[in-house]
From Swiss-Prot:
This is Proto-oncogene tyrosine-protein kinase LCK. The modification Phosphoserine is found at S102, S162, S194. Its EC number is 2.7.10.2. There is a cross-link at K99, K276 (Glycyl lysine isopeptide (Lys-Gly) (interchain with G-Cter in ubiquitin)). The keyword Hydrolase does not apply. The modification Phosphothreonine is found at T159. Binds to the cytoplasmic domain of cell surface receptors, such as AXL, CD2, CD4, CD5, CD8, CD44, CD45 and CD122. Also binds to effector molecules, such as PI4K, VAV1, RASA1, FYB1 and to other protein kinases including CDK1, RAF1, ZAP70 and SYK. Binds to phosphatidylinositol 3'-kinase (PI3K) from T-lymphocytes through its SH3 domain and to the tyrosine phosphorylated form of KHDRBS1/p70 through its SH2 domain. Interacts with SQSTM1. Interacts with phosphorylated LIME1. Interacts with CBLB and PTPRH. Interacts with RUNX3. Its main location: membrane. Non-receptor tyrosine-protein kinase that plays an essential role in the selection and maturation of developing T-cells in the thymus and in the function of mature T-cells. Plays a key role in T-cell antigen receptor (TCR)-linked signal transduction pathways. Constitutively associated with the cytoplasmic portions of the CD4 and CD8 surface receptors. The gene is Lck. One of its GO terms (cellular component) is cytosol. One of its GO terms (molecular function) is identical protein binding.
Length: 509
């Protein structure tokens, strides 16, 4: 290969493509027949750019036209129904419900923001994922429902205005993996992965690599599968009547009460936590719930609504695979390799880093309070509830329900709960993850755990636990709370750990 400045023989057109340091132009194969434009300011742009998650866009749509990605049946007064593919004009863009007019019927009403995409753009394409990180692309493509050759195109995290192609592949050594290719821009508006062949648009690029791998790891088969999104909760529906909820299936019972799968107003699938009567003050609960509903993050279970008359109901988003501690023991959970387990730990650390940033405390962090979606996304539940419990069996150190094995020594001995006691609990949670749901301190009673901790004992490294991960656990279990790491640090280490275990890019054949 060569450019105007060198003839270094290399052929790697993956995301770490070589660009000449002097002319800033891609190093083109010497035997290539393609004639790229003469250097005239076409260097690859490299400013860093950050992207938000799947939230409503902050800036107004330029032409106010959107296209429906899914059909929507109205469920509230003032809603506007529409069919998939229908075009609408946005009249007011605020929050998660936008006022719109159908160009088909002329009717006006409110629509859920996540059911539509900007018209005359890439956003309606099933293979285009606008605000998706590299790591989340891997999570989505490796989720159930996707297969060899499943793919997506996303905005580049490192280069503004550029895109990356992510493809699911099978590796003989690593099993199912995701490989990433940088899509480069031409001055004339075209695109290329390898300069041997360029395309006027991304549609042409997708069409070409669907018909032939042409140097990629595999042919593109079908776009990454996603489920129809849950419509946003209606903002005014916070304190709701009990009659609006139908409890369908009892999912389990925990320290606070029972958990049910149910439906709100007959159409929205939700999880309902029914708290035991007398377990907490309704007034104290409502005050805390108003704080909890402000904590919105992709790694936190979304709190939708409450019933404030006893028995208190907490209505949240429904997570198909239930609690992490139970899921890890299922056939699907047992099959998860250490890479995926570490990814789950990284997701939880990400959510706890947000709680840390908000100066909030969980107080009961363990695998039983982590929920798992159908795409194996992990979300933190029950944050803040432990503080409100008025049951002595739960709050007293000797209480039968007190989670001794997850609780930091200062919280056991003095009732001192801080974000640093949450860090201790996170270290215990890591042992649950790598052992597929084993109870911590196997073979020990709660009093024995307390006695051993006072003597400086720490849990031994579980079987199959990487040394680096055990080192992270030991940092979480430092005696002095101030010596324990932050969740932001834990998140960064686990993110790097996850990336490192995925393996480096391989040269394209």
């Amino acid at each position: 290969m060569g450019c105007v400045c060198s003839s270094n023989p290399e052929d790697d057109w993956m995301e770490n493509i070589d660009v000449c340091e002097n002319c800033h132009y891609p190093i083109v194969p010497l035997d290539s027949k393609i004639s790229l434009p003469i250097r005239n300011g076409s260097e690859v742009r490299d400013p860093l750019v950050t992207y938000e998650g799947s939230l409503p866009p902050a800036s107004p749509l330029q032409d106010n036209l959107v296209i429906a990605l899914h059909s929507y049946e109205p469920s509230h007064d003032g809603d506007l129904g529409f069919e998939k593919g229908e075009q609408l004009r946005i009249l007011e863009q605020s929050g998660e419900w936008w006022k719109a007019q159908s160009l088909t019927t002329g009717q006006e009403g409110f629509i859920p923001f996540n059911f539509v995409a900007k018209a005359n753009s890439l956003e309606p394409e099933p293979w285009f994922f606008k605000n998706l990180s590299r790591k989340d692309a891997e999570r989505q493509l490796l989720a159930p429902g996707n297969t060899h050759g499943s793919f997506l195109i996303r905005e580049s995290e490192s280069t503004a205005g550029s895109f990356s192609l992510s493809v699911r592949d099978f590796d003989q050594n690593q099993g199912e993996v995701v490989k990433h290719y940088k899509i480069r821009n031409l001055d004339n508006g075209g695109f290329y992965i390898s300069p041997r062949i360029t395309f006027p648009g991304l549609h042409d690029l997708v069409r070409h690599y669907t018909n032939a791998s042409d140097g990629l790891c595999t042919k593109l088969s079908r776009p990454c599968q996603t489920q129809k999104p849950q419509k946003p909760w209606w903002e005014d529906e916070w304190e709701v009547p009990r009659e609006t909820l139908k409890l369908v299936e009892r999912l389990g019972a925990g320290q606070f009460g029972e958990v049910w799968m149910g439906y709100y107003n007959g159409h929205t699938k939700v999880a309902v936590k029914s708290l035991k009567q007398g377990s907490m003050s309704p007034d104290a609960f409502l005050a805390e719930a108003n704080l909890m509903k402000q904590l919105q993050h992709p790694r936190l279970v979304r709190l939708y609504a409450v019933v404030t008359q006893e028995p208190i109901y907490i209505i949240t988003e429904y997570m198909e695979n239930g609690s992490l501690v139970d899921f890890l023991k299922t056939p699907s959970g047992i099959k998860l390799n250490v890479n995926k387990l570490l990814d789950m730990a990284a997701q939880i650390a990400e959510g706890m880093a947000f709680i840390e940033e908000q100066n909030y405390i969980h107080r009961d962090l363990r695998a039983a309070n982590i929920l798992v979606s159908d795409t194996l996304s992990c979300k933190i539940a029950d944050f803040g509830l432990a503080r409100l419990i008025e049951d002595n069996e739960y709050t007293a150190r000797e209480g039968a329900k007190f989670p001794i094995k997850w609780t930091a020594p200062e919280a056991i001995n003095y009732g001192t709960f801080t974000i640093k006691s949450d860090v201790w609990s996170f270290g215990i949670l890591l042992t649950e993850i790598v052992t597929h749901g084993r109870i911590p301190y196997p073979g020990m009673t709660n009093p024995e755990v307390i006695q051993n901790l006072e003597r400086g004992y720490r849990m031994v490294r579980p079987d199959n636990c990487p040394e680096e991960l055990y080192h992270l656990m030991m940092l979480c279990w430092k005696e002095r709370p101030e010596d324990r790491p932050t969740f932001d640090y834990l998140r960064s280490v686990l993110d790097d750990f996850f990336t490192a275990t995925e393996g480096q890019y391989q040269p394209q054949p």
